[in-house]
From Swiss-Prot:
Main localization of the protein described in the UniProt heading: secreted
Protein name as annotated: Brevinin-2GRb
Pfam family, one: Antimicrobial_2
GO BP, sorted A to Z: defense response to Gram-negative bacterium; defense response to Gram-positive bacterium; killing of cells of another organism
Tissue: Expressed by the skin glands.
Keywords: Antibiotic, Antimicrobial, Secreted
Gene Ontology cellular-component terms listed: extracellular region
Family the entry assigns: Belongs to the frog skin active peptide (FSAP) family. Brevinin subfamily.
Location(s) in or outside the cell: Secreted
Function comment: Antimicrobial peptide active against the Gram-positive bacterium S.aureus (MIC=25 uM) and against the Gram-negative bacteria E.coli (MIC=6 uM). Has no antifungal activity against C.albicans. Shows hemolytic activity against human erythrocytes only at high concentrations (LC(50)=180 uM).
């Protein structure tokens, strides 16, 4: 259904956003940007 599709899109967007935040944090913490 539509709700399931929207939910999957939000989950996918959240995962990719979280991954980029984690990458930024780890590179700043290790001074390896």
């Amino acid at each position: 259904g539509v709700l399931g599709t929207v939910k999957n899109l939000l989950i996918g967007a959240g995962k990719s956003a979280a991954q980029s935040v984690l990458k930024t944090l780890s590179c700043k913490l290790s001074n390896d940007c």
